[in-house]
Amino acid sequence: YDNVNLDEILANDRLLVPYIKCLLDEGKKAPDAKELKEHIRXAL
């Protein structure tokens, strides 16, 4: 998750929505989103 720029994702709805859907198991998982989901507790 070191390669994931959370500030960029949070500032851009086009990026944020797919990440949220991935975290909620509601959408396709992009590689970065999947990696973030695996490490979400450490990332936050």
UniProtKB/Swiss-Prot annotation:
Keywords: Antibiotic, Antimicrobial, Secreted
GO biological process, one term: defense response to bacterium
InterPro entries: A10/PebIII, OS_D_A10/PebIII_sf
Transmembrane segments: none
Subcellular location: Secreted
GO cellular component terms given for this protein: extracellular region
UniProt cross-references to Gene3D superfamilies, sorted A to Z: Insect odorant-binding protein A10/Ejaculatory bulb-specific protein 3 (1.10.2080.10)
Function noted in UniProt: Has antibacterial activity against the Gram-negative bacteria E.coli and E.cloacae, but not against the Gram-negative bacteria P.aeruginosa, P.vulgaris, K.pneumoniae and S.enteritidis or the Gram-positive bacteria S.aureus, S.epidermidis and S.salivarius.
Family, per entry: Belongs to the insect A10/OS-D protein family.
Name this protein carries in UniProt: Viresin
Species of origin: Heliothis virescens (Tobacco budworm moth)
